[in-house]
Amino acid sequence: MKKISQVLNWLSSLKIAILLLLLIAISCAAGTLIPQQESNQFYYDNFNKNPFLGIINANILLLFEFDHVYTSFWFLFLLIWLGLALSVCSFRRQLPILKSALNWIDYKSPRQIAKLSVAQTIVTNNCSESLEKIKLNLKKQGWNVKETDGRIAARQGVIGRLGPILIHLGMILLMIGATYGSLNGKTIEKFLAPGRSIDLLNNNEEKGLTIELQKFQIERDPQGRAEQYKSIVNVIEPNGSNESKEISVNYPLRYKGLTLYQADWSLAAITIQIDNSPKLQIPIEPISELGEQVWGTVIPTNKDGKNQILLTVDSELGPVNIYDNDGTLLTKLSINKEEKVKGALINIINIIPSSGLLLKHDPGVPLVYLSFAIILIGGSLSIISTKKIWVLHENEKSMIYIGGLSNRNLSGLSKELPNLISFLEN
């Protein structure tokens, strides 16, 4: 039993809790700095040439699961250890402190009062009357008062002892919610052009919600830079009912546990007409060699497919740059403008943007929100000082002894006692 007690004392020590919090904070920082959930090849390409912190290459990174820090075995172990430490601390330290604060202690001798942190002695002509005044004054100031055989015990702020317990409970719930969300949550990133949709599966791998992009709009500043982008999406239930919602950057849609973010934008296709052909919707792809936000495609201008040109564009507003196969810029075509290019009449009908949507389903979010609320309440309660006052009298000496304790702000309590004395003197 002695060894078990020693282990529990070590486990619930403040030093261990601080060390665990420090390790978890460092782990979260690593998870922020290192891209998560990428392919193994991504880490080999990026971290073998430039190791993280100069020493952690791709092999070490993958071995210790830094590619998915928040679901790694060692990170979950740290969370479980911290949760266990907080639980043991609450049961072995905080609950007994709360229980002690709720118990009434009956001090019967002046010597006990004199040993308290704050103590005063009052000479009075009428002890019974003075005790009654003190009792009424304490009640008036919000103290909980108990009188036993002419002895007064009073306490205030006992609820403050509940604060640390609530903080521990909130932190445990926070870790449970975050872990549950990491293990069971889902994240989907998808670019959709207007009219396209994505089907989501429920927990039984059956078709659930359908997210359809109805309209996508990019707002640009006078220099042509994207300032805001908005999507109007239809959320379609399996039974066919649907709701139309608008989302934009910093204004996501929350729907039955699903959060839909407006995360990015792109260009999906160019609608073009060559000579007398029907309107052709040609997909375009990013061309990183030409710039960070440049999309393009190669098309032939005649039926044999040999006379090719490169179309590039960096905005849904145009223009479309047309290059020869040797890289020479032939022309720039605006939307709904047509021009002869290498013997073919080319007309740009429109440029179709696509909306970058980020879908997140995190079942741990309600528990995380609840935990934050509990932590805030616990933190607020922890500020409250728990104060206790005892009052005794000796009729033979016409003396009243008053003393008190406080877990914090002892100077505040030492100022209250003179006020009580002043009240009696008046």
UniProtKB/Swiss-Prot annotation:
Subcellular location as annotated: Cellular thylakoid membrane
Taxonomic source organism: Prochlorococcus marinus (strain NATL1A)
Keyword Thylakoid attributed: yes
Subunit structure as annotated in this protein's UniProt entry: May interact with CcsA.
Transmembrane helix keyword on record: yes
HAMAP family: CytC_Ccs1
Family recorded in the similarity comment: Belongs to the Ccs1/CcsB family.
Protein name according to UniProt: Cytochrome c biogenesis protein CcsB
Spans traversing the lipid bilayer: 14-34, 72-92, 162-182
Keywords: Cytochrome c-type biogenesis, Membrane, Thylakoid, Transmembrane, Transmembrane helix
Designated gene of the protein: ccsB
Origin: domain of life: Bacteria
InterPro entries to which the protein is assigned, alphabetical: Cyt_c_bgen_Ccs1/CcsB/ResB (IPR023494), ResB-like_domain (IPR007816)
Cellular component annotations (GO), alphabetically ordered: plasma membrane-derived thylakoid membrane
Bilayer topology: Multi-pass membrane protein
UniProt function note: Required during biogenesis of c-type cytochromes (cytochrome c6 and cytochrome f) at the step of heme attachment.
Biological process annotations from GO: cytochrome complex assembly
